[in-house]
Every structure is written in C-alpha cells, then in structure tokens.
A protein has these predicted regions:
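Type III/flagellar secretion export determinants
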Residues: 1-206
C-alpha cells in the first residue's frame, strides 16, 4: 500500500499600517492511500511550478479534466490538469492585454520558485506583498474559464513571502491512479476581513 499524510498550521499576529493587530490561525491536513493490486506505470513528465492561491478552500487540488496552456512559454501549448474549484493561479498581466498568454505571466512556472520571484517586488521589505508595494495593484487571480480578477477585488490584502516545505506527491490523481501534480510549499495570505488563506507552489505535470 502507498500512504501519504501532510499537516500544515500557521499562527501569529500581524500589525496593519493603521495600527490594528490581527491574530491569525490557519491549518489543513491532507492524506492519501492506495492499495496497489497490480503494477502501476506512472507517466514521467516535466513538472511546472506556478503559485496557486486558494480563495474558497484551504489547499490546492486538481481535477481529472485538462486545459491547454503554454506553461513553459516555448510557443507550444501543454495539456495541464484543471485546478479544483476555489483555487486560482496568481498572475501578472505583463502586457496589459487582459489575458494570461503563457507561463511567463505566472509566478514560478519558469524559475521553479514562485515565492522568490514574487519577493523581488517587496519594495518596503516587510516580507509581504501588500498595498505598500506597487505590484499589488497589478496582481490578479486567474482561471482559464473565468479570466482575471484583481487580488484586491477578491479580498486578498497581503501575501506572506516565506513559505514552508509541504511536500505531498499525490495531487489530483486521475482515473488511472497517476498523480497530476506535486505540492511543494505553502504560505499564507491575509484577507481584508482579517482572516487568512493559503498560497502554494503546486508543480503541474505537463
């Protein structure tokens, strides 16, 4: 049998620019078990690593359906598993055409470290991407079927830039039992209402 478990928790206090203190606590647990009754052949493929922000759930998952998208920005579209409902890619529309054209407009799809890419925009050095950073007003969440929504419009106030490792190999197993992605690391974001959610590096099999 193959078994995998993961627990994540975060707690702390954050002081906002207007002097308010927000106490936060967040956690989730994941588990996977498969009884292997016959030999399983896993398709080896390249992993692409975009950041995913979970607006309506605590952790990212993948569906057994796919969409076409040039995740590695090589001019050829790749077949990728769809994010489960409630999760979105964190995106930056660099050419302002109201579309996400390829993986260069996501975080981590090319470098493999989306949190490090995002940290380059932390102008005030407070370890958050928030209203004190000029990129905040340009960041969006994105799903192919829904298009772009500004992070401020969906209630995201700040994204913490220091993730912890949360390795989980079996994300979105398809009907053949093949993993469609790997969870690498997790951090948190603060909502405008004072609650928190998760941001994760999710490696997709292309």
């Amino acid at each position: 049998a193959e078994r995998e478990q993961l627990r994540f928790s975060a707690s702390g206090s954050v002081q906002t620019a207007d002097g308010k203190t927000i106490d936060l606590k967040l956690g989730f647990a994941m588990s996977y078990q498969q009884l292997q009754l016959s030999e399983r052949i896993t398709r080896e493929s390249a992993l692409k690593d975009p950041l995913v922000i979970n607006l309506e759930k605590q952790f990212a998952d993948l569906q057994d359906t796919r969409f076409e998208f040039d995740i590695d920005s090589d001019g050829t579209k790749d077949s990728l598993a769809n994010l489960s409902q409630g999760s979105y890619f964190l995106a930056l529309d660099k050419n302002n055409n109201q579309e996400i054209d390829n993986g260069s407009e996501l975080f981590g799809a090319q470098s493999g470290n989306g949190f490090a890419e995002l940290a380059q925009y932390d102008e005030d050095g407070n370890s958050f991407i928030d209203e004190g950073d000029s990129i905040y007003a340009k960041l969006s969440v994105w799903r192919p079927e829904k298009g772009l929504m500004a992070i401020a419009d969906v209630g995201v106030g700040a994204i913490y830039l220091h993730p912890v490792e949360t390795q989980f190999q079996n994300i979105g197993n398809n009907s053949e039992g093949e993993s469609q992605g790997v969870l690498r690391s997790s951090s948190i974001y603060l909502k405008e209402d004072g609650t928190a959610g998760t941001v994760q590096q999710l490696d997709l099999r292309a």
